Swiss-Prot record:
UniProt-annotated catalytic positions: C373
Family to which this protein belongs: Belongs to the PHA/PHB synthase family. Type I PhaC subfamily.
Enzyme class, spelled out: transferase
Annotated gene: phaC
Protein name (database record): Poly(3-hydroxyalkanoate) polymerase subunit PhaC
Catalysed conversion reaction: (3R)-3-hydroxybutanoyl-CoA + [(3R)-hydroxybutanoate](n) = [(3R)-hydroxybutanoate](n+1) + CoA
Classification via PANTHER family: POLY(3-HYDROXYALKANOATE) POLYMERASE SUBUNIT PHAC (PTHR36837), POLY-3-HYDROXYBUTYRATE SYNTHASE (PTHR36837:SF5)
Entry keywords, A to Z: Acyltransferase, Cytoplasm, PHB biosynthesis, Transferase
Biased composition (Basic and acidic residues): 143-152
A Pfam family recorded for this sequence: PhaC_N
Functional pathway: Biopolymer metabolism; poly-(R)-3-hydroxybutanoate biosynthesis
Annotated source species: Rhizobium etli (strain ATCC 51251 / DSM 11541 / JCM 21823 / NBRC 15573 / CFN 42)
Length: 636
């Protein structure tokens, strides 16, 4: 019946055009009439097996629902005001109020959308007739549907139904974005939040995320008689159970990697530790080393081994091979015992503790320091504190994708305003920390179309196990945030922008970046969605000394972890960070490949003296355990 109905609506003689019509169509592959034989992969062949598998999939879905509901019934999970859904509803209601409050405004917006829909519908009807309309006129230009990996399957354009859905989706997404941008009377933060939430909704409602509206999913479901859904719903239940009531999105095969076995392999020793960190010294691989040791302060929002994923990608190993004596702070994965550990504690018991350890192990008081992301923000604040205290141990500082000014801090600012922060602080007070899954989801939401929905479709609708990928393993190996530390960071940096306003109080002292006179290598990545290059650029001008501002290709991770042997990307140098970022970048000099050798040369320019290679701990400190240590092994 289904096949006959299709043939009545779309007779083959109307859908298959002759060669003259085809040659008269638009260039660049404008399609001829639709061939009904293309529907064969979409026709159900074994309804009985499909029905049985559908029942099995529903059974697995019920198990997923039970895994989600059970901890809530036991009171182990309570929905709180920090749920993004709560703020999203409040924010988008303001957009809705603006457009509904004026009938003329409402009518104009609806007319624009309906006009776009009508154009798409007319084109779809004409495509049913062939490459030209019923009167022989050329088809109207196809709306801009842009390149999008979600719609790479050829049937998104070849099949009129899916082509129609695709075009409607893009037109509707653009229309909703325009509603936000043209809403008057909203403050900048609220409009930013509204735009962000609209992108989340449109990403979630993409036709690529549903079986009935995704040609590839539909064909695979028909071809396997629904076996993909049985597997997918089983994995969904497993992942909700693994997350103890929250979905732990399956992005990679977590069983294929282990820290210390497959990653974080650079030889070294843990030579000191306290409540919040371990200090690792790596074994030398050269006969001589630079006199000044190198201290790396990584972020605590993720784990340090992003800089030591494997020997081929390891920044740490590369530094060791260049003759650097490398020390790394490995932060604890905090729990309730660390609730009161604030920024001052991380500065004193982290960076200062590491500097004291380095002096004991090497006898050196002068150090080169590197800070990555929030680790760089802490390093910058600690440098300002040291300047206030006349502490001159750190002689140069390198900042990877580090924000010190948060004026242009990007989409993470969506999650920080007084109302949301107060709710978050109340939530953290109960346990003493913020669970790592909350931060992980926030980061994934920044690129939902790349980091959430493709994996949702692949795992739970296609029923495919994800491929092993070391970077995604690291991304999923999230950490908790100590309550006092996280609250200080969000309130003083994202909310108040206190560090560049000379309003930050650290360990009882008001600090200023203008007091930081040492040379700084400030690295931004061009496509960074966490620490935008424009934000890093602006931050460069608040230091009191010379800043070498460098921009590298790619994003927050790939731009930093870019070994020279890969011959990927490029970097730009162009003198002081003055004027506008866009102008600076246009005038900067581009160099192909990795920025690592450029940075190494910068380090040696400031002190290239060498001494005999050192052993971990020297004569003063005994090894506690092998690198990468036990703190990094603690899973959330």
């Amino acid at each position: 019946m289904y096949n006959k109905r299709i043939k009545r609506v779309l007779p083959p003689e109307e859908m298959v055009t002759d060669s003259k019509q085809e040659s008269g169509g638009q260039k660049n592959g404008d399609k001829t009439g639709f061939d009904a034989t293309d529907l064969k992969p979409y026709l159900l062949k074994d309804p009985e097996t499909m029905a049985m598998n559908f029942a099995r999939a529903l059974e697995n879905l019920g198990q997923a629902a039970s895994a989600w509901l059970a901890p809530r019934e036991r009171g182990e999970i309570t929905e709180t005001a920090i749920d993004p859904m709560t703020d999203m509803v409040k924010t988008l209601s303001k957009i809705s109020e603006y457009w509904i409050s004026d009938p003329r405004r409402t009518f104009e917006a609806q007319t624009q959308l309906m006009s776009s829909f009508f154009g798409i519908w007319m084109r779809s009807m004409q495509r049913m007739q062939g490459t030209r309309g019923m009167q022989g006129e050329p088809l109207p230009p196809e709306p801009d549907t842009r390149k999008d990996k979600r719609f790479s399957d050829e049937d998104w354009q070849k099949n009129p139904f899916f082509d129609f859905l695709r075009q409607v989706y893009f037109v509707t997404s653009d229309w909703v974005d325009k509603l936000v941008s043209e809403t008057d009377g909203l403050d900048e933060h609220t409009k930013h939040k509204a735009g962000f939430y609209v992108k989340q909704i449109t990403a979630a409602l993409s036709p690529s995320n549903f079986i009935a509206t995704n040609p590839q999913l539909y064909r695979e479901t028909i071809a396997s008689n629904g076996e993909n859904l049985v597997r997918g719903m089983k994995m969904l239940a497993e992942d909700i159970a693994a997350g103890k009531g929250e979905l732990r999105l399956r992005q990679t095969d977590m069983t294929k990697f282990a820290v210390g076995r497959d990653m974080a392999l650079t030889p070294g020793k843990v030579i000191a530790q306290n409540d919040i960190c371990q200090i690792i010294q790596y074994e030398a691989s050269t006969e001589t080393v630079l006199k000044r040791p190198l201290l790396i302060c990584p972020p605590w929002i993720n784990k340090f081994y992003i800089l030591d994923l494997n020997p081929q990608k390891s920044f740490i190993k590369w530094c060791v091979d260049q003759g650097q004596t490398v020390f790394v702070i490995s932060w604890v994965n905090p729990d309730g015992r660390h609730a009161e550990k604030d920024w001052a504690a991380y500065a004193r018991e982290g960076i200062d503790f590491a500097l004291e350890t380095i002096e004991k192990a090497t006898g050196e008081k002068e150090v080169n320091a590197v800070g990555y992301c929030v680790g760089g923000t802490l390093l910058a604040a600690t440098l300002a504190l040291h300047a206030k205290e006349k502490n001159k141990r750190i002689k140069t500082a390198t900042l990877f994708t580090t924000q010190v000014d948060f004026t242009h801090a990007g989409d993470l600012k969506v999650f920080v305003d007084e109302e949301q922060l107060a709710a978050l602080e109340e939530h953290m007070q109960a346990a003493g920390y913020l669970d790592g899954s909350k931060m992980s989801m926030a980061f994934n939401m920044l690129r939902a179309s790349e980091l959430i929905w493709p994996y949702f479709v692949n795992s739970y609708l296609k029923g495919q196990e994800p491929l092993p990928f070391d970077l995604l393993f690291w991304n999923a190996d999230s950490t908790r945030m100590a309550a006092a530390n996280h609250a200080f960071y969000l309130r003083n940096c994202y909310l108040r922008n206190a560090l560049t306003q000379n309003e930050m109080i650290l360990d009882g002292k008001r600090i200023s970046l203008k007091d930081v006179k040492i040379p700084i290598y400030n690295l931004a990545t061009r496509e960074d969605h966490i620490a935008p290059a424009k934000s890093v650029f602006l931050g460069s001008r608040f230091f009191g000394g010379k800043v070498e501002f460098v921009v590298t290709g790619s994003g927050h991770i790939a731009g930093v972890v870019n070994p020279p042997d890969k011959r990927k990307y490029q970097f730009w140098t162009g003198g002081p960070a003055k004027g506008e970022y866009e102008t600076w970048l246009e005038q900067a000099s581009e160099t192909p490949g990795s920025w690592w050798p450029h940075w190494q040369a910068w380090i040696e320019t400031h002190d290239g003296r060498r001494v005999a290679a050192r052993k971990p701990g020297g004569d003063a400190l005994n090894a506690i355990e092998e690198a990468p240590g036990s703190y990094v092994m603690e899973r959330t």
